[in-house]
Amino acid sequence: MDFTEIHKRSRRKKFQQIHQDRKDEMIQQLGRRFHNQPSTSATYPSAVEDIPLPSEVPNVFGAPPPLTNADFHRNFLVDPDVVVSHSASLIRSNRHIVKAEDAEQYMMVSRERVGTTAERVLEDFNSRVIKPLKAKRRLQIDVPYIDHPLHSMRSKTPERKENEEDSDSEIRSSDSSSDAEYGSDVEEEPDSCRRKKRTHKIQKADSSQTKVEEKERQNTLLRMGIERKRNHPNAIDPHISYNEKGLGNDSPECRCPFPIRNRGLKHGYYAGENQVLKCSKNDRANLHYYTLHVTPAPNESQIQKTQMLINGMEYHFEGFTMVTHAPLPDCMTRRPVFKYSIDYEFQLIEEFMPTECFDPEDCNSIFEYIFHDIFELLDFDLYPKHLPPGTASCPTIHIVPRFVAMENNTTFIWSSKTVLAFFLLHGKNNMFSPEDVEKNCAMSDDAFGRTIAKLKQSIVLNPMKKPSALRADWFSRDLENKEMFLIQNTIRSQNFASPFLPQIAALEKKMSRLKQEKKDSGNKNPHYENLKAELIVLKDKHREARQLKLKLPVKDYIDTGLKPDVVAHVAMAIIASHHIRYNFSLSVFEKVIEYKFNDRRIVELALIHSSFRSYYGTTPDHVKNMISNCGYRKKYGAEERREKKKGIISLFNIMGGETSGGEPILHNERLEYLGDAVVELIASHHLFFILNHHFEGGLATYRTALVQNRNLAKLAMNCRIDEMLQFAHGADLINEAEWKHALANAFEALMAGVFLDSGIAPCDAIFSKAMYGKDPEMKKVWDHLNEHELKIEDPLGDRDLSRITPALTDFHRLEQIIGIEFNNIRLLAKAFTRRNVPFNDLTKGHNQRLEWLGDSVLQLIISDYLYRNFPLHHEGHMSLLRTSLVSNQTQSVVCDDLGFQEFVIKAPHRKNDLKMKDKADLVEAFIGALYVDKGLEYCRSFIRTVFCPRLKHFINSEKWNDAKSHLQQWCLAIRDSRNPNPAMPEYRLLGIQGPTNNRIFRVAVYFRGERLSSAAASNMHTAELKAAENALAALEKASFSRMREKYMSGRQHRLHRIFFS
């Protein structure tokens, strides 16, 4: 057993031990966090008696304490820069570049080398290299593809009918025998309801059976696709993957229905690519040249590189030049925002290139030869797809190989003619002729090694095989039969499963069961060690089975002249091509929305769907196969294992800021979280001022209609977001409902991006144009906002009234407390006028409309603060923090701290007692009045100063988690990781008591069919929260009992089982 295997096995055991330790301490951690005790995860108790019992806490989810001077340790009005993944702006190079005339003459003048001229090199290349290659490729046997069904455009979950009852009602109404004591309080269900529920159960069972059958059918088709590739007559080996047009390693790359195949980035349709592109030798000066710089250099620390020695100068392959027909946008990002699973990055550098070095026809032939004929990237196409079929056009980007040499601060670069001559020199003949094979077989071993050393790690090509191109690691010979073979050391494809995997899985399951029996009984099972040894042997065999050594005859193989360093440049060129075309599309998009981004990184992020995890610019399997078959060889098992980020402990650590480092979140869900608040405020603002006589209930109804996904999806399509959204090429967004939901989220993310880039005003303009751009009259009504009625009466302010009106004079003291002076002090008075106050000419009504508006303002400013200051938090984490900050409890504390109760304008003969909800409404109404009088910036300063310092309390005490969420996380922590549908807490209504104006709801919480606790309250939500708190207290006591049992010795463990079980 080698050292690598020992190291890997020890590392695997280390991760298994870490996972087991985390699982063992999880419930103890949850109990500690529930009661806000200091961490005990660093060291375990030394004895059972040292484990602390939980303290009795009546209510752990209380309001935050009042603010002190220590809470203002930082300036909450100053934000860090918005975290993005890459820096922007293009780089311009100042290198002195000239054409390598000597190299061109050397390659073409000598008849022994190429035997052509600069005028005839393209013709000779096509006739002596391309034509024979395509003729040989046509000799391959055409095996029909496996016919896979297209993805369905219907929704995976059928829409509910309006009269169809929710499944939760069935869960809540169905009760066990333990609920009999409350059975008299619940009315008996009619027969029609029972029939509907039985029908629903039958339909659900049929749907589950259909899903199982569909999954089995898909697995069968996948296996058939894999077997087809394994048994292909032209495959060089059953365990080596190869590329075919439109096909991945196991199934077709695109299974989209025909109606949607002519749209979207995933099908190669880029916005704005609807013009015929033509360039010729005479137009070369109007083209734009950008060097694709790949870091780290692919040939760094490598012996074998793509290079050629000419007249004492060493020309090496530097990468590719990307030639475009228009200059790249000035605000274009250096690199794309999305991720790709390749260990390289690239930058586009604007650089001068001699016009005589570029010829469009030469470059098109070189591109076809490298990308399609050698590496078989058959789905990679640079021609615009919006043009009618048969329309002749240049590709959107010309990709030119760069061979350079440096001398005296001057860079000499090959022309496209010289590159053609290079490939003609290597590709016109086979790598070894029969005479060469016979000569090499007659050599001594030392001479043979020196002869073929220069061919080591060459990329060789045989167009009659699949894959056509391979990396030749070494060459061997059969002296008896006078034959030569190329050797490649590789790894079998993961699609071709090892026969040892089922046996390994069965043994691991059996060992896990024996380990649990040993833990329970304390007796060692004699079969355990035998199974462990057998498992080690099987894993060694599995490892050996993954490794593969190919030995192929050299007949019909040609040397392309390329080495594995070219592979990384090719992969980066594909991604860079998408990046360039996408940024040209963004320029069209900016014209549509009539807004130019200062930083395009934010709009790129806003248009990346969460399914878009990694992208290669073409079929992912094609790029992976190219890297595996032709790239530098990687050691098997050398990849780093990343720690999983899921789990309740990780959640608490993230929320508490205890994570070190972290990767940026490269999709639009964080922006969608912020954009939801932006869109809500825009809609609230317009409705508030347009419908100035509508009550808050009607305004809320209209706002719901405006911000619903159906409407936002239409606005997204009006902005052509459907042409710009980047998402995975699969079945996720095929059906119409999910597609519209994704468009709505993308529109909200776009609003957030514009808000972060320039503020709320451009967001308002884009929303207005998207909503009513096709109806000028309606757009005029939407854009024309009336002033508030109190401001209309006194356009210059009404502070003079406070001198003669005692009711207004009292608010001067409040202005001194908060440090803000209102222009219209009657607005401030209206914010403190409750609903039960009769209508009067002073305030013109109560504060409910202002409270409705202030809620939207508060949501946006808190969301903006969390987005900017917690860049590594997901949208779910930020939602938890926002909920804790804008809750009624927090707002009631703010109301008490600022003394708002003293200034409430109440009705005559009414008590001044305010409930928690009343105090919260008072704060929101004040924010609404401040927004109407002073604008968003004053609200931002007030909310950042009053609310945001309290966030530290919620983070440190971990009270951002309510009881129901906490109980759900507890149940998830003890789930079986192999179960895709873990059990969740169920809340059931046991009974309703009392008159209609004073109802008491009794609720019980169940887990895995057992009741955990019950509680009663005046509404369902509060009753569920109390039931969850009671369940947590009971579960915590039980968890500490189990932890004590864990630290017992074997004898103590058995005695405990005997006496206490």
Swiss-Prot record:
Q: Where in the cell is it found?
A: Nucleus
Q: Which domain of life is it from?
A: Eukaryota
Keywords in alphabetical order = Developmental protein, Differentiation, Endonuclease, Gonadal differentiation, Hydrolase, Magnesium, Manganese, Metal-binding, Nuclease, Nucleus, Repeat, Ribosome biogenesis, RNA-binding, rRNA processing
Needed co-factor(s): Mg(2+); Mn(2+)
Which of the seven top EC classes does this enzyme belong to?
hydrolase
Q: Which reaction does it catalyse?
A: Endonucleolytic cleavage to 5'-phosphomonoester
Q: List the disulfide bonds.
A: none
The RNase III domain, residue ranges: 586-759, 811-935
Q: Which residues bear the site annotation Important for activity?
A: K917
What EC number(s) does this enzyme carry?
3.1.26.3
Assign the protein's first listed, main location to one coarse class.
nucleus
Q: What does this protein do?
A: Executes the initial step of microRNA (miRNA) processing in the nucleus, that is the cleavage of pri-miRNA to release pre-miRNA. Involved in pre-rRNA processing. Cleaves double-strand RNA and does not cleave single-strand RNA. Involved in fertility. Required for the function or synthesis of the let-7 miRNA.
What is the recorded name of this protein?
A: Ribonuclease 3
Species assigned in the record: Caenorhabditis briggsae
